[in-house]
A protein has these predicted regions:
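Cys/His-rich short segments
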Residues: 1
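Functional transmembrane core segments of multi-pass inner-membrane proteins
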Residues: 4-6, 12-17, 23-117, 160, ...
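Aromatic-anchored segments of alpha-helical transmembrane domains
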Residues: 40-43, 148-152
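Membrane-embedded alpha-helical segments of multi-pass transporters/permeases
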Residues: 44, 72, 123-127, 155
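Interfacial loop-to-transmembrane junctions
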Residues: 89-90, 127-149
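Extracellular/periplasmic helix-loop-helix junctions in multi-pass membrane proteins
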Residues: 110, 126-134, 156-165
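Transmembrane alpha-helical segments of integral membrane proteins
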Residues: 116-130
Length: 166
């Protein structure tokens, strides 16, 4: 009974994040905190009822931390090189919830998909003169799209990719 309610709320939060970042260029910290708290509570409940191992919870927590550090690094390096923020604070604040929600290796699939889709859309917008090269494009919608792809097909995509490496 808990899972459908959880996924419905997650879907609504992801839709709010998608639309607010797309329309206003911001992801409210309150929404990110609510999202993270909800995912953390859900994961702890899964562990308490034996539907998730403590090791998997730790791996998800490490995914959350690792993604956050990666995004902070990207923001700092683009600030140093280009003198602009490459990622907004809302994107960075969203990363722990996504890492905890997806865990490893789905988070890798989700972030890869977000960057690929975001790059394609960005190039298309510049190509069709809808945006200039120095204008920002909200990244939150692409993080949401990447997360949804990872939730639905992340395991299959990861298995396919690993199979290609062997």
């Amino acid at each position: 009974m808990l899972q459908p309610v959880f996924w419905l709320i997650v879907g609504m939060i992801l839709l709010i994040i998608f639309m607010t970042d797309l329309l206003y260029g911001v992801i409210p910290l309150s929404v990110n905190l609510l999202f993270f708290s909800l995912v953390l509570l859900y994961r702890v409940i899964l562990v308490a009822f034996g539907q998730m191992t403590v090791a998997d919870l730790w791996l998800s927590a490490l995914s959350a931390f690792g993604l956050s550090m990666f995004f902070i690094f990207l923001q700092k390096i683009t600030k140093f090189i280009k003198k602009v923020d490459g990622l907004g604070d809302g994107d960075i604040a969203l990363s722990p919830a996504l890492g905890l929600l997806l865990g490893w290796p789905k988070i890798a699939v989700g972030i890869f998909m977000a960057f690929v889709i975001g790059s394609i859309v960005g190039i298309a917008l510049i190509g069709f003169s809808k945006k200039k090269f120095n204008q920002t494009i909200p990244f939150g919608p692409f993080l949401v799209i990447g997360a949804v792809i990872a939730l639905v097909w992340g395991g299959s995509i990861w298995s396919w990719y690993i199979g290609m490496l062997q």
